[in-house]
Structure formats: structure tokens, C-alpha cells
Amino acid sequence: MAAIREWYGGYSIIYRWFEKKFGEDALYEYWHFVAREVYPDLAKKFQEGGPAYIAAYFTEIILEDEGKLTVTADKDSATIEILECPDHIWQVYYDQGYSMPNDKYYKSYETIYGDIAEMAGYDFEMLKFDTQGRLKFRFTKKEA
């Protein structure tokens, strides 16, 4: 889900506008729509590649935009801890005083990746997040 660096702040603004105009429920509905419409192929790759693929995917997209993370994977789960999230790094870099991420920005991760996990046959658990660019989450295979 790596994005163009200059757009990260735009996402924060869009999410704030969307919630203000249409309400919190509509914002979550939008994120669910994005997951269903944009990420079925990624969900299939998660399903087929398993936890090792999930860990490799996040490693690639976070390092690509100069973030830092640790990952662990076993046969049933992948845990991703983002130590420096590119979203935060680049929003700080390009900030004009209006685009810094808030908790709703990171809730988009929980919602969208939660839906991707569901499509792939995994549970998704947001273990921690803050508005300083640190997140930790886990994908765990559902019992058959």
C-alpha cells in the first residue's frame, strides 16, 4: 500500500474532511469499500504466500519509503512492528501545519488491513499504535 510521499498529508486531510462532512460511520464504510475494491489481489497473495509473504510484503513497502520495522513470522502468523512509519516521516517532512496524522489516520490501517486479512483467511489484530509513527499488528491464520 505504499503511496507517493507527498500524498500522505493529503490522506489525513481527506479523512478529516470525509468524517466532518459525512460522519465517522461513513468514513469507516469508505475504508471498507477501499479494501474490497482495491485489495482482493493482495488478499489472495497473503492467502497463498502465508505469513512469510505477509512479512516480506510489509518489509518491502516500509523500507521502500525509508521507514523502519521489525517482522516475525511463523507458520501461523506474521507480526509487524513499524518503528518509524513512512506515513509519519513524510507528513512531518512536507507538513504545512494541516496534515499531521491523527488516530483516525491509523485506524484506516486497522480497518483496511483487517478487511484484507478477512479476505485472506486471517484474523487481524492491532497491537498498538500512536500518532508518532509507531504501529504493531499481527495477522494470524484462522482455524480451519
Question: Locations of the language-model features?
Answer:
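Well-ordered mid-protein domain cores that form the structural environment of catalytic cofactors
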Residues: E110-D115
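N-terminal accessory segment detector
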Residues: M1-K107, E118, D123-K136, K141-A144
